[in-house]
């Protein structure tokens, strides 16, 4: 069984438990004052395994499934036996990295809560875009696929605009920083291991897309 599927199963089970138990929800949700005042750093991780509702859970997990399977397999091909471990490490660290700006901004805000795997899923999606920028991404209500290298910047710009606007209850900051972390992780892992020139491969695939 793949790491992606295992993470999805765990996330679904924990989220379902939280839907039916306010105690589980409150114990696992990302609440910055609980981190700064009570050293409950585990919340950086646990909040990624609970969701606000069924729609939130479904959208995150279906996105994670399709991109995660591809990225996990690519990591195994590139990094060999260490690939799956690196993939899991990227996902878990992305949960933390994507929330650090949120924490610094809201560490004394007793009214702030955040939950969901979006930051880590964003890291996986953008690692996938870096691996295969020409792969087309399909969205609801748009009758054509958008190449990853076009979708990525557009997604980040829209997320930044929505984050600045601040008119909804979505943590767009986590999406943005999760995306940056996924890109950075693959670049660094490829460089340190000497097994993958992520930037070079990305540029070559984009050039091939325009020349084909």
What function would you assign to each model-found segment?
Residues 1-212:
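A detector for small-residue-rich transmembrane helices and their helix-helix packing motifs
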């Amino acid at each position: 069984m793949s790491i992606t599927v295992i993470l999805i199963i765990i996330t679904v089970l924990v989220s379902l438990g939280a839907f039916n138990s306010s105690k589980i929800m409150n114990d696992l949700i990302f609440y910055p004052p609980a981190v700064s005042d009570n050293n409950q750093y585990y919340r950086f991780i646990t909040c990624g395994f609970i969701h606000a509702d069924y729609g939130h859970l479904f959208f995150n997990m279906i996105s994670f499934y399709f991109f995660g399977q591809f990225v996990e397999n690519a990591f195994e091909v590139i990094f060999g036996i260490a690939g799956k471990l690196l993939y899991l490490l990227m996902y878990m660290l992305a949960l933390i990295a994507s929330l650090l700006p949120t924490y610094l901004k809201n560490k004394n805000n007793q009214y702030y809560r955040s939950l969901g795997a979006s930051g880590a899923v964003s890291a996986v999606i953008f690692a996938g875009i870096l691996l295969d920028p020409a792969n087309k991404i399909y969205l609801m209500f748009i009758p054509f696929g958008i190449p990853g290298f076009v979708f990525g910047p557009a997604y980040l710009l829209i997320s930044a605009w929505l984050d600045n606007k601040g008119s909804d209850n979505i943590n767009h900051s986590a999406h943005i920083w999760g995306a940056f972390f996924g890109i950075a992780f693959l670049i660094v892992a490829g460089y340190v291991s000497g097994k993958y020139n992520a930037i070079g491969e990305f540029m070559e695939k984009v050039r091939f897309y325009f020349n084909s």
